[in-house]
Amino acid sequence: MYARYQRDQGYGYVTANSTGSSIIYGAVPQNAMVALNQVLKPNLLNEIKVGLNAPKTRVYASTPNVPGVDLSGVTISLSGVVSLGGTAGQQGSVGIASPTGQLKLSSALNGRAAPFTNYSLSFIDNLTWIHGNHNVKFGAEVRPEHLKTAFYGGTTYSFANIQAFLADAPSQVAFNGDTTALSPFTGKSGFSLMHQTFYIGYVQDEWKIRPNVTLSYGLRYEYYSPLHESNDKVLWFDIPTGTLIPNYTKDWYTMKTTNFGPRFGLSWSPEKSANKTVFRVGGGIYYGPGLTEGQTQPGVNDRINRTITSGPLLTYPDTPTTFLSNYNINDPNLQFQPRAYLPGYAIPEQIFQYSASIQQQLPSDTVLTVGYVGSQGRNLFLRGITNRITGVVMDPVTGVGSAVREFSVVNGTTVTNKFAEIDTKTSGGSDNFNGLQVMLNRRFSKGMTLGSQYMWSHSLGNSDGSKDARTSADNYSQSSEYGDNISDVRQSINLSALYELPYGTGQAHGATTNPVAKALLGGWQLGTLFNARTGTPLDIEIVRPDIVYRNKVTGAISAGPVVTGGVVMTTPIVNVPGGGASRNVRRPDLVLGVNPYYVSDGTLYINPAAFAVPQPGTYGNLARNALRAPGISQFDLTVSKKFSITETKNLEFRAECYNVLNSAIFAAPGGGTPRLNDATGIIQPGQPYTQSAAGGTFGALTSTVSNQVGSGTNRQFQLALRFNF
């Protein structure tokens, strides 16, 4: 019998941007385990475990201390660019940094803090039965999961430019309330207390058919009960009826019960190879519950949120009290924005994995392995929108167009929207991965070890999985998202070597030399590491308004109506079918015959002239993740020296140099999603972008992979001293 308890505590501080805004992280993970091992019979062993895992985390937004200015829970979003005035080595203009007292709490919610106090219990029993050439294992686990969560919101003020900011004239004010506040929908307050339980069972047999043939096969079953809120503090949006249901008690999604996962593996070493050749093949079906954050939306919905684009509340600054006191859940034009699940949303996600390899021992203690690995993902997480735009009505006097949505109420030219555009989640995504692996390794022998790995692979799909899934650019189909996944790295190589100077006690040379020489020349090790890979995918996106205006005479497209002499000269039309501005995942058209990459050694990497604004009423034809970031490579070096103190104690000094050649290792432009500016009225649909229209830093290499110690940095040195005993 044994018991274990571990508690860690750590804090992190990350600068958000150049304004001094930052994010503070705190984590206090705890885990405990009690286990009892029993020998029931000489060939029958049983293990019982009871465990606790309690990851307590806190994350806060921190703002700079400016006298007379309180940015707690506030974001100032400024559009436009600032000229750099010909600063040497820089682009002509840069975007404006936004002072903020908020951080990204989830994929669709910003706020000032998020405290999570979660824990899970594990009750596990494993039974091992050895019978002849069989090693059979049976096991079961019950794991209750408990989540105590909250999101503290904030206010975002958006300004069209610096002049509007100086005039205190925001174009939009977005307010998110706290999930712990008293809800006008459910009448409840406090933390969300969610729970679910995992049920897992398996049987597995390792059968040594012959001394050179081993077969492993088994079956695993997993079931994850749907999440529920303990007090039904839930606000459910029903998509078929377009209504809110407070204190919803039914399951939020379907949890499948047929989650059986067979697995097998076979290894064979031909007798004639003298155990120097091994063939391996295997496969299995695996299940996963998906990302928990994506399954908690009905609980997160139970809060006040509103977006102001006109009226007396469109002011700066304002207070949360103003938004709360004027909030009427029965307002027909409330524009409430919950998050919703499509009918048919089902869990779990499913992965089919399979592999085959051949391993051959070569002279000089070297082993060559060539293998294939593949997988197929099914029922993966997908995102989209509902309450889509279906049409436009125009004010006959001003020419202004108002979007008509699926749940809108239209009375003449007046449109009221109780709901804004709504983020949806569902299942049904797919992906596939195929990879060729080649490894050549030399075990530590005669003072040297060598390692080399190469992989060619390709990952495709219409979903990047729960954590990285993005909203479909086509609001009516997920099939258009099929393309390279963000994790797709076509080629990668890693080379490593470690050499120990053969001098000193136990070495080929210097074993009997004087102690001073052994102390100076013995115990040295030299290590090198080289890694390189091709670039990761780039998803080129574009900012487009949901509605644009077509001139009745010239056909030109503009961002707003044109009225001349009291006559409306334009017609409002739907620019992006269905809308989607809240998620802002839109792609441009690709201009044929134009190289999308700049052919130069400068920092401009993506050529905006290769892209154009799509015609109104159409989606861009550029595929998801169609371009590639620059590849990267890095060479590192380590030198170490051990000073023996006694037979079991020594002092080790290490000197490490990262990126010895000081190569520029640029990060993907735009964080992997370079976005073209909204150029409505600047260039017409079908007209290629210019650099100024795209944005001064569009497609530019402006940062390195990392500014910390390790991979992707500039040349850095690190010294370490360690006492081994």
Segment roles from a protein language model:
Residues 8, 16-24, 63-82, 118, ...:
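Flexible, surface-exposed loop regions and adjacent strand-edge segments
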Residues 128, 195, 212, 224-226, ...:
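Short, solvent-exposed micro-motifs at the edges of structured domains
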Residues 67-75, 79-103, 229-425, 554, ...:
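Solvent-exposed loop/turn elements at secondary-structure boundaries
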Residues 2-52, 56, 229-260, 389, ...:
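Extended hydrophobic/aromatic segments used for targeting, binding, or gating
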Residues 1-45, 49-50, 120-122, 196-224, ...:
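Surface-exposed extracellular loop regions of Gram-negative outer-membrane beta-barrel proteins
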Residues 17-22, 31, 35, 109-113, ...:
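Extracellular loop and loop/strand-boundary signature of outer-membrane beta-barrel proteins
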Residues 8-17, 26-28, 97-108, 177-185, ...:
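Flexible, solvent-exposed coil segments and beta strand-coil junctions
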